[in-house]
């Protein structure tokens, strides 16, 4: 089965040697996204809610480039700098995934790239 590299200017360019996403068959594997504004290339300043929104918007843009949407997401992994931000992150998360409710794990990590508060990766399935 062939794999296809997914890239869009509507999401941040990767900050390392990886793709924004890879599509294999009906699956789309979105790389970890941090709250970088794709227009400025800068980290979104602000609290966990603002950073969560930017991360999900980045994932959404990548999925759209692959012909999918947030409704097609089946699994999300959330990395938080501080698990005390869990409830606030969930407030924003539920605005985007309230209906589809993909499987998910959320973990606290000691540090994230560029010292952001959150990173998310997603797997989608699109027929």
From Swiss-Prot:
SUPFAM superfamilies: YjgF-like (SSF55298). Belongs to the RutC family. One of its GO terms (molecular function) is deaminase activity. This is RutC family protein PYRAB12510. GO terms for cellular component: cytosol. It comes from the Archaea. CDD domains: YjgF_YER057c_UK114_family (cd00448).
């Amino acid at each position: 089965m062939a794999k296809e590299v997914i890239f869009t200017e509507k999401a941040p360019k990767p900050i390392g040697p990886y793709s924004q996403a890879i599509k294999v068959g009906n699956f789309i594997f979105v790389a970890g996204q941090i709250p970088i504004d794709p227009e400025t290339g800068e980290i979104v300043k602000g609290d966990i809610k603002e950073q969560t929104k930017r991360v999900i918007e980045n994932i959404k843009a990548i999925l759209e480039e692959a012909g999918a949407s947030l409704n097609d997401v089946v699994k999300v992994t959330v990395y938080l700098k501080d698990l005390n931000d869990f409830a606030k992150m969930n407030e924003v998360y539920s605005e985007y995934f309230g209906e589809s409710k993909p499987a998910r794990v959320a973990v606290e990590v000691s540090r994230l790239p560029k010292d952001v508060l959150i990173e998310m990766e997603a797997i989608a399935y699109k027929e």
